Curated annotation (Swiss-Prot):
It comes from the Eukaryota. The modification Asymmetric dimethylarginine is found at R16. It comes from Rattus norvegicus (Rat). Pfam families: Abhydrolase_6 (PF12697). This is Protein phosphatase methylesterase 1. Residues 1-38, 255-280 are annotated as: Disordered. Belongs to the AB hydrolase superfamily.
């Protein structure tokens, strides 16, 4: 493993592996928790951060797709927010509250296909081209032929899709572009170990609280406030799924049924039904999307991304969790002044969740600097040195 890949993994992957059974068990409840200290892992509704929610219908060749968006603000440019792989529009919740208080703008946070509450006919097609078209179609469905000024802001996979959307000119009123912690070089290096990372995650959780607790204690999201609203969009409640214990009981019951005579089979069937009922009471939660199955699209998201980003003829902003993430093309581009860059240290990969206020300040400063938006609430720009 190269030094570059090692340094990338330290910020991008969880800082330590989850404790055995932490996804849904109470084994990790005392981990590094002082006596009497207790944190609240209960989920928080989207309505505490966004003003409204809308399901946008889009017509295409396969029929009608429905894309979930969360909105805030009524004036100024539209900040169209695209989440990372496996996340949802709710990952932008805390950032939304922060940016709305700094500049006059409108927020549209979109659940990309196969993520969150978006429903599409062909949920297996996660190619960069298809998702970029989705973004353009949603803008057209919401605003018609005369869309307001739009700035695309994307994190990780969403950052790649934002660049593909901009490069294909699918949003005619696009005025700016922002990528958050996604760089072609480090992203391509990370793909080799991504399956191992995904296999290391818990497959199910006993409750939303357990999912939120795992996300924070594993380091996936370092900001508890964001995790309490964001994880709701990452997991779903399963109907009819069986836990390992219940599965074992059912299998043992089937074996026993084969060995029993007709008189005993009735009692075995009764036990099996009781096991099934007990399982349904648990209703474990699992991930909304199986990211491991999307592997064939990963290369298409990130290959050639740096040059594609540099080629977009609009003001550009790159926010990174560490300067070590820069690849050769972006390093040269940054030295030539082709985009604005800001490093936000002490963050994990989910920069906008870990440090929503800092990201909001960077985006607000970018908007004001280019005269795309007006400051509100006495917000003062602090221009970065890099």
């Amino acid at each position: 493993m190269s030094a570059l890949e090692k340094s990338m993994h330290l910020g991008r992957l969880p800082s330590r592996p989850p404790l055995p059974g932490s996804g849904g068990s109470q084994s990790g409840a005392k981990m590094r928790m002082g006596p009497g200290r207790k944190r609240d892992f209960t989920p928080v509704p989207w309505s505490q951060y966004f003003e409204s929610m809308e399901d946008v219908e889009v017509e295409n060749e396969t029929g009608k797709d429905t894309f979930r968006v969360y909105k805030s603000g009524s004036e100024g440019p539209v900040l169209l927010l695209l989440h990372g792989g496996g996340h949802s529009a709710l990952s932008w919740a805390v950032f939304t509250a922060a940016i709305i208080s700094r500049v006059q703008c409108r927020i549209v946070a979109l659940d990309l296909r196969s993520h969150g509450e978006t429903k599409v006919k062909n949920s297996e097609d996660l190619s960069a081209e298809t998702m970029a078209k989705d973004v353009g179609n949603v803008v057209e469905a919401m605003y018609g032929d005369l869309p307001p000024p739009v700035m695309l802001i994307g994190h990780s996979m969403g950052g790649a899709i934002a660049v593909h959307t901009a490069a294909a000119n699918l949003v005619p009123s696009l005025l700016g572009l922002c990528m958050i912690d996604v760089v072609e070089g480090t992203a391509m290096d990370a793909l080799n170990s991504m399956q191992n990372f995904l296999r290391g995650r818990p497959k199910t959780f006993k409750s939303l609280e357990n999912a939120i607790e795992w996300s924070v204690k594993s380091g996936q999201i370092r900001n508890l406030e964001s995790a309490r609203v964001s994880m709701v969009g990452q997991v779903k409640q399963c109907e009819g799924i069986t836990s390992p214990e219940s599965s074992k009981s059912i299998v043992e019951g089937i074996i026993e049924e084969e060995e029993e005579d007709e008189e005993g089979s009735e009692s075995v069937n009764k036990r099996k039904k009781e096991d099934d009922m007990e399982t349904k009471k648990d209703h474990p939660y699992t991930w909304r999307i199986e990211l491991a199955k999307t592997e064939k699209y990963w290369d298409g998201w990130f290959r050639g991304l740096s040059n594609l980003f540099l080629s977009c003829p609009i003001p550009k902003l790159l926010l990174l969790a560490g300067v070590d993430r820069l690849d050769k093309d972006l390093t040269i581009g940054q030295m030539q002044g082709k985009f604005q860059m800001q490093v936000l240290p002490q963050c994990g990969h989910a920069v906008h969740e870990d440090a929503p206020d800092k990201v909001a300040e960077a985006v607000a400063t970018f908007l004001i600097r280019h005269r795309f938006a007006e400051p509100i609430g006495g917000f003062q720009c602090v221009f970065p040195g890099c």
